[in-house]
Amino acid sequence: MIKTNIIFGSSTFVTMRESKLLNNDIIEFDTVFSVADLSKLDNYELTLPKDIYNENINCLLSKEIKKLNEAISNNKDIRVWTSHFDIYSYLLLLYLCDYLENRDCNLYVVFSDEYNENCCSPACMRENELEELAKLEHKLSKKEILEYSKKWKEIKDKKFDMAILENKKVKLVSFDYYNEEILNLLKELGEVKIVRLVGLFMNNYFITINTSQ
């Protein structure tokens, strides 16, 4: 059956569009849940913080939700693409499980790290890899949907600077959470370009959480 694919970000969208999965519908969400005020999300609104974007930015999800509702009305199965290491798409999965927990539809999920443990997000996969990953889809049971929905409810109304994934669990932290690790890496490297510092930190951090399971 043709499925409606739910993805995060334009990178995954472009790659999926070039794959054999093109015959399936694609709904792209691009709002960053991990640093947003989630308290207004019942109205399909998100506020991104001034601390990061220099001004408060209000985002509307009504367009994406409308497409999702239309897909469900047309009896299409829903497939969410995510990873246990990608906070952006993982929070989207939690939100959708909460939104759909009382809806009559089949909900599937694929995790990129189940295809390759070093693949931290569907966004880093090629067309043929996405096609292979689709074969690993897992239909969520009602119990699983409720469990994911519960996780969403646990964080939805809490105050936090940003959400991250550690050991495959959502953790709510402050903006200075990584300060000590970044400063230690900077001391080790000495004079270094910011882009290299960020790249090395992200690589080291991914290796750390990937090997601590």
PLM regions: where:
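A generic structural motif
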Residues: I26-V35, C105-E117, Q213
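Long, hydrophobic/aromatic-enriched structural stretches that serve as scaffold segments
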Residues: N54-L93
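Eukaryotic partner-binding/assembly regions in large regulatory complexes
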Residues: I72, T82-L140
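A conserved mid-domain beta-alpha-beta active-site/ligand-binding segment of alpha/beta enzyme cores
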Residues: P122-R196
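Long, charge-rich, low-complexity alpha-helical segments
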Residues: V192, S212-Q213
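Short helix-coil junctions and helix-kink-helix linkers
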Residues: R196-T211
